């Protein structure tokens, strides 16, 4: 697999709707203010976080169980920023909707601006033929509250394309993946 450049990302997004909405360059300012950048970079695409957040709280003193997850463990927030409590986490989603080609795998890495503040972004790979808004997980590893900004860059997507003779036999769509077509912040499913 080879990593794909800005030219490929631009072409696939503009001609095939791989990323919507799509920003062909890097946006570093909004309303005259500096922001955490988003848009196309040399070998990736920096995604934005939407205004919907789910902040984890343990008010029910429950055990976190991915097979029996309690939606009541989250507080819903809609706003231009989200404060994550110390040593806690929040879920959000990308502004962008993705349609991944069959010969492509996407890996997500957090942006250094957040990582240098102790805020880690986690996303599993976007598999071939998956589509939807990406659910983002932000971990606040610090002993202090941490702020996440909506509509600004939070993570970078790297696109890897298989050789023509090595495209997967079964895509995410083929196997009926449980997160196919997700919109909004999606909680764990089994």
Curated annotation (Swiss-Prot):
One of its GO terms (molecular function) is dCTP deaminase activity. It is an enzyme of class 3 (hydrolase). GO terms for biological process: dUMP biosynthetic process; dUTP biosynthetic process; nucleobase-containing small molecule interconversion. DCTP binds at residues 111-116, 135-137, 156, 172, 182. It catalyses: dCTP + H2O + H(+) = dUTP + NH4(+). Its EC number is 3.5.4.13. It comes from the Bacteria. Keywords: Hydrolase, Nucleotide metabolism, Nucleotide-binding. The active site is at residue 137. Pfam families: DCD (PF22769). Pathway: Pyrimidine metabolism; dUMP biosynthesis; dUMP from dCTP (dUTP route): step 1/2. Belongs to the dCTP deaminase family. HAMAP family: dCTP_deaminase (MF_00146). Catalyzes the deamination of dCTP to dUTP. Homotrimer. This is dCTP deaminase. It comes from Stenotrophomonas maltophilia (strain R551-3). The gene is dcd.
């Amino acid at each position: 697999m080879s990593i794909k450049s800005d030219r490929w990302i631009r072409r696939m997004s503009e001609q095939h709707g791989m990323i919507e909405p799509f920003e062909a360059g890097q946006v570093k300012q909004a309303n005259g203010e500096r922001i955490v950048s988003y848009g196309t970079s040399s070998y990736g695409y920096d995604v934005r976080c939407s205004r919907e957040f789910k902040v984890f709280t343990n008010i029910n003193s429950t055990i976190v169980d991915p097979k029996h997850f309690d939606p009541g463990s989250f507080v819903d927030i809609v706003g231009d920023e989200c404060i994550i409590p110390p040593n806690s986490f929040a879920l959000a989603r990308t502004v962008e909707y993705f349609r991944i080609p069959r010969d492509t795998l996407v890996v997500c890495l957090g942006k250094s601006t957040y990582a240098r503040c102790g805020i880690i972004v986690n996303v599993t790979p976007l598999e071939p033929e998956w589509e939807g808004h990406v659910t983002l997980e932000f971990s606040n590893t610090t002993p202090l509250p941490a702020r996440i900004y909506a509509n600004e860059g939070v993570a970078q997507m790297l696109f890897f394309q298989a050789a023509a003779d090595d495209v997967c036999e079964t895509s995410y769509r083929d196997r009926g993946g449980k997160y196919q077509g997700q919109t909004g912040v999606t909680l764990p499913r089994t």
